[in-house]
C-alpha cells in the first residue's frame, strides 16, 4: 500500500503481511475506480462509473498496458463485458450500453471514452477480515498519508465470493 503512515502496518499488526496480501488481491485491482470508499453497492451497475472499474481491472490484468494503448478511445463493449464478468456476476453488454447510451456507437459496438478522472492518491489499509464459507469480507479504512491516522467514518466492508478455481467475484461494498 502507498502512503507514509506514521506507524508502519508491521508495527500495528502481527499479521501485517497477510493484510497486505488481502489488500493487493482484492482492493488494489479497483483502487482508483469509484468501487471503494463511501460508495455503497451490491452489483457493478450500482457503482457510479463502471467504465473506470473496467479500466482499473484491465490495467490490473495487463500490467504493462492500458485500454487506451489497445483500443484508443473507442472501447469494444463486448470485450468490456467479458473483462468485467471475470470480477462481477451478471454483467451484460446491454447493461453497459444502457448505462453509457450517450457515448455508445452502435455501428462499431464501442464506447467512446477519452479518459480523465482527476483526483489524488487514495490510501487504504485492511483492518480485519472474516470468512464465512465462500464469502470473504474485508474491513478496510482510508487513512491520511501524512499522519497515518484513519479518516473519520471511513471504515468500509468489501465482500467477495471466493471461487474454487482461486478467482473471486466482487459482491458488494458498504460503510461499516
Residue spans for each PLM region:
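Mature, Sec-exported extracytoplasmic domains of Gram-positive
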Residues: 1-176
Amino acid at each position: 500500500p502507498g502512503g507514509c503512515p506514521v506507524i508502519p502496518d508491521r508495527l500495528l499488526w502481527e499479521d501485517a503481511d497477510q493484510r497486505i496480501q488481502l489488500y493487493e488481491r482484492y482492493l488494489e485491482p479497483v483502487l482508483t475506480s469509484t468501487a471503494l470508499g463511501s460508495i455503497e453497492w451490491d452489483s457493478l451497475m450500482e457503482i457510479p462509473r463502471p467504465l473506470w472499474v473496467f479500466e482499473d481491472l484491465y490495467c490490473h490484468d495487463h500490467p504493462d498496458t492500458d485500454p487506451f494503448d489497445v483500443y484508443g478511445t473507442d472501447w469494444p463493449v463486448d470485450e468490456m463485458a467479458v473483462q468485467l464478468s471475470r470480477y462481477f456476476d451478471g454483467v451484460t453488454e446491454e447493461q453497459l450500453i444502457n448505462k453509457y447510451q450517450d457515448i455508445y456507437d452502435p455501428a462499431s459496438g464501442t464506447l467512446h471514452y477519452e479518459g480523465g478522472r482527476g483526483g489524488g492518491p487514495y490510501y487504504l489499509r485492511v483492518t480485519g477480515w472474516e470468512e464465512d464459507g465462500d464469502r470473504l469480507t474485508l474491513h478496510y479504512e482510508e487513512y491520511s498519508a501524512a499522519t497515518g491516522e484513519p479518516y473519520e467514518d471511513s471504515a468500509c466492508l468489501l465482500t467477495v465470493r471466493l471461487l474454487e478455481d482461486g478467482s473471486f467475484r466482487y459482491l458488494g461494498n458498504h460503510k461499516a
